[in-house]
Amino acid sequence: MRLPGMLRPTAERHFHSIFYLRHNARRQEHLATLGLDLGNKSVLEVGAGIGDHTQFFLDRGCKVLCTEPRGENLDVIRQRFGSNPNVTVDHLDLDGDLPAEAHQYDVVYCYGVLYHLSRPAEALAWMCDRAVDLLLLETCVSYSGEDEPFLVSERASSPSQAITGTGCRPSRVWVMNRLREKMPHVYVTATQPRHRQFPLDWRANGPIASTGLARAVFVASRAPLNLPTWSRSFRWCSAGAEAHM
């Protein structure tokens, strides 16, 4: 007989599935190619899950405030990094009451989080206010050209889904416009991670990934980024576009 606690995977089993491990690897592999100065920074990591992205910044000499809304995920983060003097772990719900007087950090890191929020505009504004230099953002998006966040239902019981049960699939236009309301220099990457959920051709009618998800990577900066890896405008189809598996 299966016990009630065995009916769903633990947070570690959920986040360490083959899909998640490959997805994380492709995203951080891509981040490392973008030419950003991410060494020896103070970093606010939001929606950290179980902390699988945290080591990327620790390996670069950063000090990280690792935040997450779910208690079960925070327990895993504390087990992993509790003895590391460069990691502070704290509870933060981006869909909850956000502290107006929170500290600022050189870099705010928000990968795979925005589309799990029911109030994405408020969260983006708050994160921009926390960023001294950069806000790094990766999120699921819609193919729409409308300036809309497009709210959707999600499974609140899942350790990686919207804690309120409501998420969003904003258009790239919406994300760029909200960031431009708070930050002077906003870009989308000229390249994409080598993964099927990151399309190169945005002229299609919808995602080619079997999950039905399409993703994009953005940065909001206090200073201009004169780098070939970033673009101030959308590319609807990258040169030499090929399918990522």
Functional labels for PLM-detected ranges:
Residues 1-104, 212-221, 225-245:
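Conserved N-terminal segment of class I S-adenosyl-L-methionine
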Residues 62, 131-133:
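A short helix->loop->beta-strand "cap" motif at the edges of active sites that frequently abuts
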Residues 101, 146-151, 198-202, 231-232:
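Short aromatic-enriched loop/helix-cap "lid" or pocket-rim segments at secondary-structure transitions
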Residues 109:
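A conserved beta-strand element that flanks and buttresses the S-adenosyl-L-methionine
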Residues 116-130:
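A short, conserved alpha-helix within the catalytic core of class I
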Residues 136-160:
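Conserved class I S-adenosyl-L-methionine
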Residues 164-190:
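Short alpha-helix
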Residues 185-221:
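Conserved catalytic loop of SAM-dependent methyltransferase domains
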